[in-house]
Structure formats: C-alpha cells, structure tokens
Amino acid sequence: RRKHFAGNAGSAGPSAPAAPAFQTEPFRWKRWQRWAVGTGCALAAYSAAGFWLVPYVIKDQLPKFAEKELARQASIADVRFNPFTLRLEADQIAFREASSANNAPLLSIGALAVQLEWKSIVRRAWSLAEIRITAPQAHLTITPDGKFNLAEVLATWQRNHPEKSEGGMPRLVIAHFALEQGKVDWQDQKAGYADNFTPINFTLDNISTLPDANGSYSLSADAARGGKLHWRGTASLSPIRGEGELILNDASLPGLAAYLK
C-alpha cells in the first residue's frame, strides 16, 4: 500500500531573514584633513633636516673643507641646531697643521653659538642676533726659518681663492659679537721669544656691512710678561673706517724691547 504525502514547501517552517546589504563608500579626505597631514609631514621633514641633517653635514664637511681649502686638519666634537629658534651651537672645534709630525695646533674653540634671526628673510641681509665664541685659543708660531704659521694659512687660502674685483661684501648685520676667555700663545722660535696673552675679551655691537652703519667695539687683553691692553671705539665696514682709544698699562718694556731688537 502506498501512502502519498502532499504538503506545502513553505509550511516546513519560517525562512531565515535575508542579510542586510551594506554599501561602503570610498573615504574622502576633507580639505582641513589634507592640510593637517601635509603640514605635519612638512614639519616632520623640516625638523629632521634641522635637528639631524644640518649637524651631520657640518661635522662631515668641516674636515673636508679644511683639508681642501686650507691644507690643514680640522675636527669638531658636537654640533646642535634648532630649526625653529635658528640657533646653532658647536663644541670643541680644532684646526691643526697637517704636515707637522706632531700635528701642531693652530686654533681651537671651546664653544661656539650663533643665533640667526627670522627677519633675515624680509631684510634681505643675514641678520644675526648673537655670535659668541668661548675659550678660543690661537697658537702663533714663527719657525726657525722665519715662516709664520698664520701667514702660511692665509697664503694657502689665497692660492685657492684668487681675489675677484667684481662683487661686494655680503649683506650682514650682527647685533652682538662676543669673544670670551680667549688665549694667544706667541712663540718666535727664530728669536727665542715666547709669551701668551690671556684672558682676551672682545665685544662688538651693532656691526653691519650695510652702508653707513656704525658699531661699537671693546677689547681687553693681559700679557703673561706684564701689560694690560684696552681698546674701544666705533667702527664701520661700509665704508671701512673706525675711531677709538688704545690704552696699554703696566707693560714690560725691557722684555719687549729686547725682542723687538
């Protein structure tokens, strides 16, 4: 006996609801978002170039510059630059003779600080709020054959950079220049005379290469053999002119006279 079952397919049970359809719209950058991202990327690149690239380039290029242009050795311990305040700082800068067996020192600087101003952009001149040189030391030597080490350095520079008649001085404005606790070692090996001058302090205010801009200066130095030098006045770089007074106190004239002979 056969049994036939008839039924409605829809009566098997309730059907599962259909999944809702989601449509994803492409993300669109708003204008302020594009500006924010672009500004952030530009600031990041500028910061990286200032905080890292500038010090790296200076430390890398200074020895190469000294070797190529001056035929001397140079070193620098540390360089820091803030791209937002435009302040450059460096420590332990040294220049030495390259040909001598003991690499005789020429010039060393304990610390250097340079403060550039943003108004250089609109002023069309390099505007420096401050240049400060701390603990510089110069070693001036006349060899037994009569060669002056500083003159040799200048002669090397002039050979690599012959004078050109065209062009003038760069547009430069320095609000304050200071040299602190300087020292000069003087040694004349030909005459058998040696002396040193320390401390040397020098300040220069409002000096400029712009036309008819006058600045003031002050210099003081003490000699180990006796004597105090004071020099102050005003100066201009364009045109080159100056006036002031020079005072020498407690100088050791017998020792100096013997050397000058």
Task: Go through each PLM region and give its residues.
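Secondary-structure transition motifs
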Residues: 1-7, 22, 26, 91-206, ...
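Beta-propeller and related beta-repeat scaffolds in trafficking/envelope systems
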Residues: 102-104, 191-224, 231-239, 247-249, ...
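Terminal hydrophobic membrane-targeting helix
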Residues: 43-145, 209, 226-241, 251, ...
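Active-site-adjacent "gating/activation" loops or surface patches in catalytic cores
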Residues: 244
